[in-house]
Regions:
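Amphipathic alpha-helical interface elements
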Residues: 1-179
Length: 179
């Protein structure tokens, strides 16, 4: 209403609008945090399954050297206080790993048309990362829109579905292998 009638400004409207923006950013942060944890779990599980749980496997074979150097530097600068190396990845690193090891991740992390390619299939992670940057800086004058929040929630739901489908198919495969 205010967009069509700029003079509309009843008492308390400004405070209400600010609270709504804060709520949207707060909800978006929760969604993004869950997406990041899901990505971390999925990427690390897949790398360790494919290359082995030792650093000589998943870390060396599964993670591109440029990411290893960046993450390793942070690990060393932080004296490993956050835990092992995997606790030093950024959200966007998971996209780079997925693109680098596309054959492992295309069925798990790609959204959109089948066969659309690495860049398009993982572009949703760029969106999530850009929104993460906005809400991570409390001093930012930018708030996420309801539309942004809904898109983040949609990505979270799709990721959860794909990861659940992967778990189901892995369970079925291991059940068949055990017979």
């Amino acid at each position: 209403m205010r967009d069509s009638l700029p003079s509309f400004n009843p008492e308390g409207l400004e405070r209400y609008l600010e609270e709504e923006k804060t709520q949207t950013n707060s909800k978006a942060k929760d969604v993004i945090d869950r997406i990041e944890r899901s990505l971390q779990r999925a990427v690390l599980e897949e790398l360790k399954r494919e290359f082995g749980p030792e650093d000589s496997g998943w870390w060396i074979e599964g993670v591109h050297k440029s990411i290893r150097l960046e993450v390793g530097k942070r690990f060393e600068e932080g004296d490993g206080k956050r835990g092992s190396k995997e606790h030093y990845f950024d959200l966007i690193h998971y996209r780079k790993i997925a693109m680098d090891k596309w054959e492992l991740f295309q069925n798990i992390l790609a959204f959109g048309k089948k066969g659309a390619g690495k860049d398009k299939g993982t572009s949703w992670m760029n969106f999530v990362n850009e929104k993460r940057k906005i809400i991570s800086h409390a001093s930012s004058a930018i708030s996420l829109s309801i539309q942004d929040l809904m898109e983040l929630q949609d990505y979270e739901g799709r990721l959860d579905q794909q990861l659940a489908a992967r778990s189901t198919s892995e369970s079925e495969e291991s059940g068949v292998a055990a017979e």
